[in-house]
Amino acid sequence: MKKVFYLFTIISTTLMAQTTNYYESCNGLSGEALRAELHNIIKDHQSFSYTTTKTILREADEDYNNPDNIILVYTGNSIDKFDFASNFEPDFWNREHVWPKSHGDFDAGDPFEVPAYTDAHNLKPVDHSMNTLRGEKDFENGGDVVFNGSSLTDCFSTNSTFEPRNEVKGDIARMIFYMDLRYEGGSGEPNLVVVEGLTTYPNPQIGSLSTLLEWH
């Protein structure tokens, strides 16, 4: 038992040290210098194939109350994690690009070779109808309540904006800010920018900044 406890202590201490040192180069920085250094830290994230992201989401969005299920980001519904919609089956799940791939045109050419397209930090499980309803809309408060089939959701939508349920607003905002920081136009990648107000695709922008800051 002592050996197990000692090993656990070493592992925990090592992980804490790694976490502490991860941002060490940012100490004393602010403004654009801080942003540039944060970008340098995260720009070499490990890329996975688009197929592999299904496995990642099955783990990342697992239903803690039912490990066989996955939680859908916009409805909060729990469904079988292996019910993946290969042909847009209405009761199955597929992958939502939270920063829409059309906002930056990073689905052009062979999208499966584009890091921004396959970046698991930007993917969430949704059902087909909610994926279609959200589409390329910017994030903003307000609109009409969203029905998923005959079921009422806690989301709201207009012709140009989408408001997710309260429980995931912070997650959504941080995913968007990650994409803004990670993809700055280097090595042929898109230069993604969060802006105030509404945007038009394929411009590499998404809104609305003040609302996303509020959600964060």
Q: What are these language model-derived features?
A:
Residues 11, 45-49, 80, 134, ...:
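Short secondary-structure junctions and interdomain/linker hinges
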Residues 87-216:
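Domain-level detector of nuclease and nuclease-like folds
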Residues 12-16, 107:
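Alpha-helical transmembrane segments and their juxtamembrane interfaces
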Residues 4-13:
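Sec-dependent N-terminal signal peptides
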Residues 17-80:
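N-terminal module-boundary/linker segments of secreted carbohydrate-active enzymes
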